[in-house]
Amino acid sequence: MIEAVASANPNTVVILLCGCAVECPWADSVKGILYMGLPGQAGGEAVADLLYGRISPSGKLAESWPFTYEDVPSSKVYGKTTDALYQEGVYVGYRYYDKSGTAVRWPFGYGLSYTTFAYSNLTVDGDTVSVAVKNTGAFAGADCRAHFRFHAGVAGRAFFI
């Protein structure tokens, strides 16, 4: 249905209200996608503010979004037994996609804004990371930077922690 609407109106924007990654085979045929997660009672007002440009999106994805359900490692066993099988070990989320080389639609940490930012003066002092962030765009906006430390992981694989 989304593809049919987008074909009739090239300015279609899809608003996703969901608590996890979902398949979005129509993603390339719409003008925009606004992922709201589970926004609660003020969600409608937040959507309106974002769509009308009163505020700029600044969130980042907390998980990788696969292209299809079949790209999820548990898809091969889910529903085939009454037992819960946790065969992935530490290879869940981005770790699985990284290790297996499976392409994802949107990676962990992905997010867009109506504005742009410049970064400078990166410093690292032990566990403290600092960076100067400057809004270089035409819209007011906030930026959410995530910095990760690598752990040696299992069998020499590095993991974000």
Regions found by a protein language model. Give the residues of each.
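Cysteine protease catalytic core and zymogen-processing segment of caspase-like enzymes
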Residues: 1-6
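A short helix->loop->beta-strand "cap" motif at the edges of active sites that frequently abuts
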Residues: 7-12, 30-31
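Detector for Asparagine
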Residues: 9-11, 121, 135, 151
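Short aromatic-acidic-glycine turn motif
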Residues: 72, 149-161
